[in-house]
Amino acid sequence: MEMERINENTIRVLVDNDDLSARGITILDLLGDHQQIEDFFYSILKEVDTDHQFQNNDAVTFQVMPTNNGLELFISKNDSNFAGNEQHGPINDQVSKYIKQHLIQKNSPDQDQRKTAINDSEDNEIQHTNWQVITFDSFEDLIDFAKIAESDDVSSYLYKYNDLYYLAIAYSDSILNSNDVKDQLALAYEYGNPTATTVDFLSEHGKKIMSVSALHLIRHYFE
């Protein structure tokens, strides 16, 4: 982990994937759990703020920028010169939304079309009736399946609930009963297990980690 003091009010911290791993955290963990985001950022602050100039300030704010190898974090303490500066916002939904947007943009050269498609179709997609839900005991099992899964013709969502990962795959009516789907599900059950848990339940009670193209994103970032 690298730290650079930009000025008396701002610290820049580079957190690579090894640093995240050492803390038992992945980029995926930071996508939806706001309390975990806050705890993680303040743990970084405690580590780099050795003279306690920032920890004792009630108006500390954070900016996060995903990088190819982790995160770039800007920690600022607000004083009268920073009051009203919209560039420095508190920890909120923008953190996880920014990371999600970065993952999607990096994954596709047609990023504008993809973002539009996701925004327009996600609410409708979640109402799809032909869902197959598979549960995985570990994220490593899910990665192993994603590496060999055929995902071009399906939408897939990733949820976490009670420390288990749930992969929800939406199949169209035209291919639901095809041999290809049966073969893919049989393959999925070698790494995970079928479950009666519904997408509606996961949407209400679980934490959604990835939308629309979960299998493709997992394969891309964890190959």
Curated annotation (Swiss-Prot):
Family recorded in the similarity comment: Belongs to the MecA family.
UniProt comment concerning the protein's domains: The N-terminal domain probably binds unfolded/aggregated proteins; the C-terminal domain interacts with ClpC.
Function, in words: Enables the recognition and targeting of unfolded and aggregated proteins to the ClpC protease or to other proteins involved in proteolysis.
GO molecular function: protein-macromolecule adaptor activity
Gene3D superfamilies registered for this protein in UniProt: 3.30.70.1950
Domain of life: Bacteria
Gene, per the UniProt record: mecA
InterPro entries in UniProt: MecA_C_sf (IPR038471), Neg-reg_MecA (IPR008681)
Organism (species): Limosilactobacillus reuteri (strain DSM 20016)
Protein name: Adapter protein MecA
Assembly, per entry: Homodimer.
